[in-house]
């Protein structure tokens, strides 16, 4: 008997797969049509629930992946190090290869997966940037694991937001929803990603409403979609990871009202620092662009170099490597003196800029929160020495500082307040947090500062237009050159 042709197996398999997916989608639509009167609104809500579940699963897998790859890297370092070869020397090639591979995957397959990815989502909601979820999801997931696992000073919230938003677009494409509903599901996915990353559903909801206010299409249904996705993502994340507060710190009682003016001054300081920090991020990105000129081998070489640096730092001085989330409880707990806090603050600014400005697939939320905690604790210790009657515990300023720098850089004070409260479970710190975040935002706005993600999106669009013009010119010159040669 003749063998059954292999290509027919492939045809049969594809037909079965397409039939199964079509059957699921059609049955889901019949369910909506049968049990709901406002069919489009009901479909959007149920899809947002599904997106929230997927975003929670994705974020949980990403979180476990970071833990696993970090432990695997450390195990390799311990296995190949001994009395003659110190651990930091072994860490250099391992982390270098990890970061180099992350940079290669990003540049080769999905350049939009570089950085935090939040500006890409904002651009997509305005119709200015494409969402190529088939490429971005695997590249952001595995590239982010490699970059964060190598020891670079990056956060996982950016990848979680972009992954969640791309899941939203994937579901939109599968169910063929219209453009307006597609934007709502994109926003719902972003909210779910942030909510799951920080175990903060209210912050995830408010981030979309506050930070993406110019792109978000406000309606009752779209707002409900964002709520449902954020809540479901948080529930799924908690079920998988069994996690309550992301950061375990002291639970403070509310400070005295007469000390609130100190938190306002802290906010004013963060307003100035936030503007300078945003300018330094853009300047660092320009520096890297000048070095690699968008050439792949140069871009990957930068990744190899940074991986080597952060591989060594992760062993020698881990406090200035990694995301900084693990550093927050130690700083708030009073384990550092003022001199050490100042040095850590300055060095972490440098490592954050080197990591995030390079275009590596990772976020800046967590490093910003760590920087805010460092400066807040430094300010609190100084205030405690100057006003011992007003300041009983400097740690309250560390908690307020977490939200202060975030509010100044992102220009989202309400999100900053909710994010810190949900991350630390310090609900009685709400008033000092509000004063600090509003003070930071007021100063940043008064001095002409702009939200960092808005500036990053504008920069991305300018670079994209410049590359298109260069490509058009190159094609035109290539058509003209043969003609001139013939003449």
Model-found features: residue ranges?
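Alpha-helical transmembrane segments and immediately membrane-proximal extracytoplasmic
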Residues: 3-487
